[in-house]
Amino acid sequence: MGIVQIVNSIFSSNTYILSHTDSCRVWLIDIGDIEPVIARLLPGQQIQGVFLTHTHFDHFYGINQLISLFPDCIVYTSAHGQEGLYSEKLNFSKYHNHPFVFSGNKVKILHEGDRIEIFRGQKLEVLETPGHDPGCLTYFTENYIFTGDSYLFDTKVITSFP
């Protein structure tokens, strides 16, 4: 499996592109800036889905552009995360320059222990890791773990606001 990290323009959040040489399927972990994601796709590759670590706007502000380009793309999140997709207050975009909500409806709710096959014989496993946000999910496969803001090296994670 190949992984490409993109550091996004808002709050330096990350998007990860997961691909495999034996597949045209591509998966994302979070989606911020869409342009660098599209620039890294090879001819014939299709984004199948995006796994959201949580639904604070800096982790999914590129979602509507993504869905317009890949209308069959599925958004994977927690039940609380689904609420954040459709609430500019819960996703905190209301308090920044560009309030928005998700305009699509292809959402799959994930739970602790779910395993989704992303490539032949390779699954992404789901861990519920509430703290920074009640709906935080962590994903792992092989030797990789994607924590979103549940764990930030050398940084205090904010779990509530004054």
Protein language model features and the residues they cover:
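Divalent metal-coordination and catalytic microenvironments
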Residues: 18, 30, 54, 66, ...
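Active-site HxH/HxHxD metal-binding segment of metal-dependent hydrolases
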Residues: 33-120
